[in-house]
């Protein structure tokens, strides 16, 4: 059975989470999307193509919900 790279969800105040991702991992915020009126999904990428998915809550807390490696961005395809 595959094991998760994170044993549990890690939550911190949003400013501290941002600082952790930038300073410890060298990550930059690559994309965001609204998940609900109170939740924003953030995708962070580091220089080695590792990725971290974070949910930022309106309450001021952010939680790492997934991590992985070998991120690859795709260009939208023309449907025609």
Residue map of PLM features:
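Polybasic/polar functional segments that serve as interface/processing modules
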Residues: 1-80
């Amino acid at each position: 059975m595959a094991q998760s790279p994170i044993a549990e969800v890690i939550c911190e105040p949003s400013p501290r989470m941002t600082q952790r991702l930038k300073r410890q991992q060298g990550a930059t915020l690559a994309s965001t999307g609204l998940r609900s009126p109170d939740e924003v999904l953030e995708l962070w990428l580091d220089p080695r193509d590792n990725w971290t998915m974070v949910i930022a809550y309106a309450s001021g807390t952010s939680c790492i919900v997934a991590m992985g490696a070998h991120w690859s961005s795709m260009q939208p395809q023309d449907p025609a």
